């Protein structure tokens, strides 16, 4: 039985002027997603996806490269203005914001959306090194 050919997802050329950059900076990796105002992802990149492995993923330089990669892909959609939302305590927070600024976007606002518990779950035990 012959399988029908898989439909490739072609990039639809949209003209989106305003976007939202979500930067999730954990201690091990940095994920940068650029979406439109409704939350539909336009482009994304991670520190591991752009070629860094192991402990080098958690460096500020890896977050900078990931933000540049996601930013260049979002420029193809016509994104000009960015609202930045940063989540997490990782080392790539500031360098990812600087990289998006250097890519040529006009940054309208920077918001910290790190979730803070109102004394919810018990945190993991402290590390003894």
Swiss-Prot record:
**Which BP terms from GO are recorded?**
translation
Q: Which Gene3D superfamilies does UniProt cross-reference here? A: Ribosomal protein S11
| Keywords associated with the record | Ribonucleoprotein, Ribosomal protein, RNA-binding, rRNA-binding
Entries under Pfam families matching the protein = Ribosomal_S11
Entry GO CC: ribonucleoprotein complex; ribosome
Q: Which GO terms describe its molecular function?
A: rRNA binding; structural constituent of ribosome
Asked whether the UniProt record includes Ribonucleoprotein among its keywords, one would answer yes
What is the role of this chain? Answer: Located on the platform of the 30S subunit, it bridges several disparate RNA helices of the 16S rRNA. Forms part of the Shine-Dalgarno cleft in the 70S ribosome.
- Complex formation: Part of the 30S ribosomal subunit. Interacts with proteins S7 and S18. Binds to IF-3.
Identify its protein family.
Belongs to the universal ribosomal protein uS11 family.
Mind telling me what this protein is named? Small ribosomal subunit protein uS11
């Amino acid at each position: 039985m012959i399988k029908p050919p898989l439909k490739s997802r072609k990039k639809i050329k949209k003209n989106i002027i305003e976007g939202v950059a979500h930067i999730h900076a954990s201690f091990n990796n940095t994920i940068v997603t650029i979406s439109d105002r409704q939350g539909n992802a336009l482009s994304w990149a991670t520190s591991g996806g752009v070629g860094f492995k192991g402990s080098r993923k958690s460096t500020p330089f890896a977050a900078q490269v990931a933000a540049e990669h996601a930013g260049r892909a979002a420029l193809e959609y016509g994104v000009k203005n960015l609202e930045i939302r940063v989540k997490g305590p990782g080392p790539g927070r500031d360098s990812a914001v600087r990289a998006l600024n250097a890519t040529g976007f006009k940054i309208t606002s920077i918001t910290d959306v790190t979730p803070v518990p109102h004394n919810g779950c018990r945190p993991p035990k402290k590390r003894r090194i």
